[in-house]
Amino acid sequence: MEVLRRYVLVFTSLCMTLFAWGENLQSIEADFEQIAVNEDGVPTRYEGHIIGKMPSKVKWDYKAPLQKEIYMNKNEVIMYEPRLEQVSHSRLKDKADFLSILKSAKKHNDGTYHTKVDGIEYVLFIDKAQKPERIEFVDSMGVKTTLKLKNVKLNGAISDKKFVFVPPQGVEIVELHSR
């Protein structure tokens, strides 16, 4: 569940970055590279594609090192791991109040944006084109994560159908308890 919570917080932080450029933000699409360094200094690198649509829909499509899809809509989280032929379904007890969280990001003199969500501080960076470039944070387990975004598209049309998961026939569906 900590992993699912981390995905929600990263997406929330990403939305916070985008909000700083205006209230008309409706969607984001980007390729990403995520590097998580544990307390022992051992890095794990992930890459994939993310799409998000306000107020609370997101799909993480991990390509490497293993394929994984994560769908989020409000407080519902679905994680599909094709290699395991398994779908995990859960509901988070606390769904994010996106407007309040988005408004909490504060611009610092160095041009970065900082916010704190559930005791975790997020540092948000933008590029010269005023698009989100990077998010850095250390989670409650001491894992330092850097999320680098590339090929960022803002406010493009994204069909709601892209956020609907239909489980393949024969996969195991595991219901996880709410957190």
Swiss-Prot record:
Q: Does the keyword Chaperone apply?
A: yes
Q: How does the annotation summarize its subunit structure? A: Monomer.
Q: Which organism is it from?
A: Helicobacter hepaticus (strain ATCC 51449 / 3B1)
Q: Where is the signal peptide?
A: 1-22
Q: Mind listing the GO biological process terms from this record?
A: lipoprotein transport
Annotated S-S bridges: none
Q: Can you name this protein? A: Outer-membrane lipoprotein carrier protein
- Similarity-based family: Belongs to the LolA family.
Q: Which Gene3D superfamilies is this protein grouped with?
A: Lipoprotein localisation LolA/LolB/LppX
Domain of life, per UniProt, equals: Bacteria
Name the GO cellular-component terms: periplasmic space
**Assigned keywords, A-Z:** Chaperone, Periplasm, Protein transport, Signal, Transport
